[in-house]
Amino acid sequence: MQAAGEIDDDGFMDMVASSTPSVGYCNSMGTATTMNSLAEGLGMQLPGSAAIPAPYRERGQISYETGLRIVDMVHEDLRPDRIMTREAFENAIVINSAIGGSTNAPIHLNGIAKHLGVALNNDDWQKLGHKVPLLVNLQPAGEYLGEDYHRAGGVPAVIGELLAAGLLPHPDVLTANGKTIAENCQDCRSTNTDVIK
């Protein structure tokens, strides 16, 4: 727009400054939003935490709750290897397809799985994710921004929709809060079906 003469330098800077709420937050379904969503989908983040924009007060609240929960997890001996099982990774692959996640997701999740000794490869992504419908209408492929994703219900709403459709392969996997993914999300639905279908 600037190169075409449609806006001046000040207009360009205003557009850039308003395109994202702050540092530390990806307002599209890039690698950061994808991996936050998949960390929650794997069960390693508290429910509802992945899509909270960085400057929101909720981000500070969930950070505090996460710190408290980590202490409890130590006392409960709830280790990452008990949460990030093969079944949890299969769920994450399905969630990635539903959110329209970044093409970097297989590289990252396969690497995390390998580190944990969980067998996961690119064939799994094709087998598990190929028939899952795209539920999230988020830029760059869609219309909406990350804040809209959060307001529409974020990852719990996506998982709730997948559960309702019978598309989440392992609803009984354990998550960081000590509950199953189904217990956390079975009643969650999108509050804006333009953003999360």
What are these regions (language model features)?
Residues 1-197:
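Catalytic or ion-coupling anion/metal-binding cores of large enzyme and transporter domains
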